[in-house]
Curated annotation (Swiss-Prot):
Pfam families, alphabetized: eIF3_N
An example Gene Ontology biological process: translational initiation
Family matches, as PANTHER family: EUKARYOTIC TRANSLATION INITIATION FACTOR 3 SUBUNIT E
Keyword Cytoplasm attributed: yes
Family: Belongs to the eIF-3 subunit E family.
Alphabetic keyword roster: Cytoplasm, Initiation factor, Phosphoprotein, Protein biosynthesis, Stress response
Effect of L332D: Abrogates interaction with the proteasome
UniProt name for this protein: Eukaryotic translation initiation factor 3 subunit E
Modified residues (Phosphoserine): S477, S479
Gene inactivation effect: Slow growth, reduced polysome content and reduced translational initiation in minimal medium. Mislocalization of proteasome subunits to the cytoplasm and impaired proteasome assembly, leading to the accumulation of polyubiquitinated proteins including cut2 and cdc13. Impaired mitosis and spore formation. Enhanced sensitivity to 3-aminotriazole (3AT), caffeine and thiabendazole.
UniProt source species: Schizosaccharomyces pombe (strain 972 / ATCC 24843)
Record GO cellular component, one term: cytoplasm
Length: 501
């Protein structure tokens, strides 16, 4: 996948993270990324076709793999390969028949209303009940896992998810339960059930964080996988960006990012910048405030700049570390090209650009009291008339409210039209590209302070911010941080004791 063919943007190919991310995904999760790259035409189509074949040739999707092989060889068929695919297909169908027969009796019992009413919270009691009344042993329960794995390799992700649900309800095998949780998470992603995927993400995170690993490298690998797999639901669920910030800023996972996958800082940056709507909300946890997240993000990007950087992270560095507005503008233009060819971020491209322009405006206005309309409009890549109207609307609440209502109505109309024209909404690629099919909105920037027009200039009214208030703001989270540190130390001591025993 190294060669380039029809790339409309060499920049997009240079900063493409697909290959880095694929190293930490299950083969079935890799496939949507390959499909996305095929649609974007940023790589050699034949190499992508070969990658799909190599990816799926060991699965049970024999018919699809046979089609890939035929397309890979220019539509020509080979008798030996055709016989090999036919033999594998017969083998798969035979195994399917055997497993269905073996599992049918178990599923009939597990779906029995009388059994469901008799179940308890304790798995041991449930297994004993199954063995005494239905002659279902732990070995027979394990067949559910085997059949789920078979269905998953056939591409029947919904069926695999249901089987894994029943398996986890009765299995006491910790290793198989852990594997089943990973499989359930992947199945929910591939069936585009984002609510279910978020629920499984929580279970998986709890399992990875609470489990005592003898080898710290194994725990690091598990957290690395979790971070990469989580990109699917977190950038598709309604509350995904906020949850992503909580997960990625959590110290163990932040350490994982800095140690093994610094490229994930791109996704953390986009999540923080696009989550500015919650900036004025007061969270129960001070560490979750937008201002705190932005400060932490700037610090982390500065620390990891030697290890990884791209236009997205460079924009934050240029704006807050270097205070170079020209460089920030240049990075912002590059961000658009990079984000529109990123599988996970294509739908957030416009939201990120809008949020980034707001940050650029606020940073520029923070160090000025009087700004030329033309200069600020140039910084934000807006028309002067647009900027003047924006400032006037912000100073007139009634006009602003009417403008917002009209914008909301327009967005709703576009959404309805988009829904009617996109019939297939359950495909990962379709969801990733929904935003790019809609007409790009006009850039909008909301100032975090008062601004008024004075001829061809904008007068910035900076709020008074006393030294006492600064001290209060900087120390009000110390109590929470101390408590969090105490809990972390207690957990570390407990883990050391268990490891010693």
């Amino acid at each position: 996948m190294g060669s380039e063919l029809k790339s409309t943007s060499p920049l997009a190919v240079k900063y493409d993270l697909s290959q880095k991310i694929m190293q930490h995904l299950d083969r079935h999760l890799i496939f949507p990324l390959l499909e996305f790259l095929s649609l974007r035409q940023t790589h050699d189509p034949k190499e992508l076709l070969q990658a799909k074949y190599d990816l799926l040739k060991d699965t049970n999707m024999t018919d699809y793999v046979a089609n890939l092989w035929t397309n890979l060889h220019g539509g020509h068929t080979d008798e030996d390969m055709a016989n090999a695919f036919a033999e594998k297909r017969r083998s798969v169908l035979q195994e399917l028949s055997e497993l269905e027969e073996e599992v049918q009796g178990i599923l009939g019992v597990l779906e029995n209303p009388d059994l469901i009413a008799a179940l308890r919270q304790d798995k041991g009691q449930n297994l004993q009940h199954l063995q005494e009344h239905y002659n279902i042993t732990p070995e027979r329960i394990a067949v559910l896992y085997k059949f789920a794995q078979f269905q998953y390799n056939c591409g029947n992700y919904g069926g695999a998810s249901d089987l894994l649900y029943h398996f986890r309800a009765f299995s006491k095998d910790p290793e198989l339960n852990a594997s089943a949780t990973w499989g359930k998470f992947a199945s929910e992603i591939l069936t585009v059930d984002w609510d279910g995927a978020m629920e499984e993400l929580g279970k998986l995170r709890e399992m990875v964080d609470s489990k005592s690993f003898k080898d710290s490298a194994v725990q690091l690998r598990n957290r690395t996988w979790l971070l990469h797999w989580s990109l699917f639901p977190l950038f598709n669920h309604a509350n995904g960006c906020d949850t992503l910030c909580d997960l990625f800023f959590y110290t163990p996972y932040l350490n994982t990012i800095q140690t093994s996958c610094p490229w994930l800082l791109r996704y953390l940056t986009v999540a923080v910048v696009t989550n500015q709507n919650n900036a004025n909300q007061k969270p129960r946890n001070p560490r979750q405030s937008y201002q705190r997240r932005m400060r932490d993000l700037v610090r982390i990007i500065s620390q990891e700049n030697y290890e990884y950087s791209d236009p997205v992270t460079s924009f934050i560095s240029a704006l807050y570390t270097e205070v170079d507005f020209e460089k920030a503008q240049h990075c912002l233009r590059e961000c658009e090209e990079v984000l529109k060819t990123d599988f996970f971020l294509v739908s957030l491209c416009d939201h990120f650009l809008e949020g980034a322009r707001k940050l650029l405006a606020e940073a520029y206005c923070r160090i000025h009291s009087v700004i030329s309309v033309d200069v600020l409009a140039n910084k934000l890549e807006m028309d002067s008339a647009q900027l003047i109207q924006l400032v006037e609307n912000r100073n007139n609440p009634s006009v602003a409210a009417a403008s917002n209502v009209a914008a909301d109505q327009s967005t709703e109309d576009e959404s309805i039209e988009s829904t009617s024209t996109n019939v297939v909404a359950d495909d990962l690629i379709t969801e990733a590209e929904t935003a790019t099919e809609a007409e790009e909105p006009e850039p909008e920037v909301q100032f975090g302070f008062k601004a008024k027009l004075d001829g061809e200039s904008i007068i910035i009214e900076h709020p008074t911010y006393s030294a006492f208030q600064q001290i209060i703001d900087r120390t009000k989270s110390l109590s929470f941080e101390s408590q969090n540190l105490e809990q972390s130390l207690a957990k570390s001591i407990s883990e050391l004791k268990h490891a010693t025993v």
